[in-house]
């Protein structure tokens, strides 16, 4: 081959086109939206970006974020889980009953009271079990995820009501003689007591830079935020660094191809619904702990919030595309938007309209991105065919 032919055969670097810019902006839309929301409300309210308000927002975001993490796994497989809100309510009632009433064993004539950590583990296991039932129904009987989880929504809510005949389990503080104290700390406790941090900040305020006092304030982050961070890290690692995560994406991208490649699709689906149930159980525990009470109506409409944060984060409802980081950003968009509107005095009725509009806009943008990616893929295929003909 001559030098001229060799030079001609070398591919020229592709130019950065306007389409590339549009795709980049679409992929980063969640991050851009969060920055815009923060910038707008920081301008409208000086108190919006204070450490104290950020901690409050983060603790509120933790609920939607943890639910969203479980929902992300499900939606990545092109599924949906409408039962997560009811499962959260059911698990809250299970935990409340175990703390206040214990486990009654009529055949032995005894009542067993569990340590608070055992209550937490049993409750989480029950959440995962409900998820496993969802996954089994979907895979074994070929029921669509929408119908299967819609049915479980009613079943779980009914079981939550039956657990206490529709009554609330109040005052979930436990008793020293039963060794089940400490449950309220799960939802509102901190690694360092806020009173200590407050004293340190007060003592340092006159001598230390503002940055130091702000960092000290963040030491009072509640356990719920740290739990959210832990769930986020574990979920992100599982999805991006393990064969299981790659199989989840493969199923959502093309389930038939995934089956032909040897992936045990049914097994993976059951596991992702178990993860969703586990996350819902964690949310139920956090809410019951924070309120120091368990109510059977806990978690109503939470499934809609979970779907919203996943969609806002850029995960495709068609499956196969999305990530945990985007879901967390989506949760913070909803949290920052809600907190900001309250701080500037937006009517609660208008808040619902605005949040709903944002979600619809996010879905529209997601569809635009999907269409653009298809168009780009088609153009690339055409260029390859032309190059092959030459």
Label each region the model flagged.
Residues 146-241, 268, 290, 294-296, ...:
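Transmembrane helix-bundle core of multi-pass membrane transporters
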Residues 30-43, 71, 123-127, 156-159, ...:
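Hydrophobic core segments of alpha-helical transmembrane domains in multi-pass membrane transport
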Residues 145, 172, 221-228, 269, ...:
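Loop-to-transmembrane alpha-helix initiation sites
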